[in-house]
Every structure is written in structure tokens, then in C-alpha cells.
């Protein structure tokens, strides 16, 4: 029953954003619900014929794709067990059909996401206000200082970091960079490479 939505998304050439809602279940509260449901959603999408039927469909998933990058090996094994022989059918390749925001709070998590799906599938995201606004007692910094984490990825060059921080979003959402520059206050940088890279709070 989602097909009419997919058809319209492709017709308009716009991006769908998957972000779970909260939970009323004590066993699966808030953040855990986000991760579990986003993981389940990705699994269902990539094991369906949605991208066969809508090859131009663009979907971005919040929170780095839930648990998917971390558990990729299990899902990879599952596709092989079910008969996947063409490399394009492997779950690791299917993962690259989606886009993922960088709302992750550790260096290891950000780096795993990039290694799993590639630079071109990572879109800078921040969560302020949100869970990540909390200040870590050990570092004294907000957990959601994601731009710093991206800039600290040692295996990426400057251009690749800028791709994640702003250039990928410009391409995906077809943003008018010149108009954005003109709209910026005079006391800000023309193209930010730090925490302002995606324009503020939310994903």
C-alpha cells in the first residue's frame, strides 16, 4: 500500500526520510525504539522489490541506519543462505541504495557507517535539541558534536569530509548554494565546515 507514495516521490524527485516515532512500551523506550524500528524498516525495504520497481527512489534513514551497519554480517549471511549469488543481491550492496544521516555519537560508529555504505551515502545530520544535546561528563562536550567526529576520520581526505558535511546534502536535496550564501548573515562563513554544516538542529 506504500506504492502510491513511492510513485509520487519518484515523480517529484524528492527524498523520503525515515524517522521513527516514540514508544509507549516500557520494554522498548524512546531511543531503543528508534534503533529497532529503523533497522526493521531497512530490512523490509531492502528485502522487497521496492527498488526494483522504483530504481530512482531516494530514501534517507535516521541515526545511521539503526543497528544495520553493526549487524551487516548477519544480514549478509541471510541473503547468501537464501540463494543470493549475484554480488548486486548481497545485503551489503543493497545497503548502498539508501542514504543515512550521521546522527551517531561516537567516532567508531561514524567511521563504521562510512566504511559500510560509502562517503556518498552519508548525509550530515545533527540532533539539537534532542538526545545528543546532552553534555558528556568525561569530555565536557555535547554528544552531538558530529561535525568534529566527521573531521576526525583519519581515512578521509578534506574533500570527502566536505562531501559528508554539506556537499552530499546539496546534491541530494538539489539545494541552491548561491541563494544559501546570499541568505546567510554577514558574520558567518560562506560554506561552513563545522557544526553549522547542515544548517542547524534536527536531522
What does each of the following model-derived ranges do?
Residues 1-29:
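Extended, charged catalytic domains and RNA/DNA-binding interfaces, predominantly
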Residues 26-46, 54, 58, 63-203:
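H/E-rich (His + Asp/Glu) clusters that bind or coordinate divalent metals
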